[in-house]
Amino acid sequence: MPDEIDQLREQIEAESIESAEEAEAFRIKYLGRNQGAIPDLFDQIGDLPPEERPEFGRRLNALKDRAQERIDEAKARLERQEQAGGPDIDLTLPGRCGFKGSTHPLTQTLDEILRILRGLGFSTHEGPEVETDWHNFTALNFPPDHPARDMQDTFFLEDPPEGTEPRVLRTHTSPGQIRIMEAQTPPIRVAVPGRVYRNEAISYKSFCLFHQVELLYVDENVTMAQLKQVLYSLARALFGEDVTLRFRPSYFPFTEPSAEVDVWWDDEDSDDGGQWMEILGCGMVHPNVFESVDVDPERYTGYAVGMGVERMAMLRHGIDDIRIFYENDVRFLDQF
């Protein structure tokens, strides 16, 4: 009789059930009280030796459960098929519109900046947000006592792995310069977008997290005039042909000479009718930076630019408070 269970299981699995009538016939054939195959085997348990009865009964109960599962599965399938063929749907009726999201204004501005830069011949490279002290400071000609290395200006990660140098949340995208020049030989023309972090006070025009785009161009005979031409081309494409720029001498450890660039921002509440908004720092790559990555400063020159995406988005859209970008206010985001 144990072999009969195996044979009956094969029959149950092979049986086709394609209608409610076939499901009822299947039930009667295998589970029917008077003539079902499985109840008939239950009646024969008493003919088995006592030691075989428990195992035979267990297997027979499992077979009974499987037969019932086949019936339940078939009924559920047939019900779904019946529902699918239910009342007709008028496809000409207007649909229900779900909530439509929008691209964040910072993402829009960043995408536009990178699109313009691609047209100017710059490729794109991304670097890590957690940087070593070497890439973030030392290789960029920051002296050991530079204020940027202090805890009040930089987020340092606690407990670096033993034998490794300190790690920080990058304070600028300039470490991308170092990583690219370590991996490539000139000529190099690249843009490095990314988030950066500063341990500084939050105000209407500064935040502890913001976005930058770094530009690096290294080749023979690169000049400051080429740098200014690229920045004018970028500003006009982004803000319009009538944009007003101002270059101011400045200081950065990794460029010499250095400059900051401001854009005139019309402001009706200002006594002067507007104000200058700083959007980027720039300059010619310092020879010490080239030497840190084994690039010959006697042969190559280059320029570097670090621009703030938030500031540019504020100028493009007339936004007067940087903090609103991070409030996730749908009323604000829906405008873009």
UniProtKB/Swiss-Prot annotation:
PANTHER family documented for this protein: PHENYLALANINE--TRNA LIGASE, MITOCHONDRIAL, PHENYLALANYL-TRNA SYNTHETASE
UniProt-listed SUPFAM superfamilies: Class II aaRS and biotin synthetases, tRNA-binding arm
Complexes and interactors: Tetramer of two alpha and two beta subunits.
Name the UniProt record assigns to this protein: Phenylalanine--tRNA ligase alpha subunit
Cofactor(s) it depends on: Mg(2+)
GO cellular component: cytoplasm
Subcellular location: Cytoplasm
Reactions it catalyzes: tRNA(Phe) + L-phenylalanine + ATP = L-phenylalanyl-tRNA(Phe) + AMP + diphosphate + H(+)
Enzyme Commission identifier(s): 6.1.1.20
Residues the entry annotates as binding Mg(2+): 256
Sample GO molecular function, one term: tRNA binding
Class of this enzyme: ligase
One of the protein's GO biological processes: phenylalanyl-tRNA aminoacylation
Cofactor note: Binds 2 magnesium ions per tetramer.
Family: Belongs to the class-II aminoacyl-tRNA synthetase family. Phe-tRNA synthetase alpha subunit type 1 subfamily.
Pfam family membership, one: Phe_tRNA-synt_N
Keywords associated with the record: Aminoacyl-tRNA synthetase, ATP-binding, Cytoplasm, Ligase, Magnesium, Metal-binding, Nucleotide-binding, Protein biosynthesis
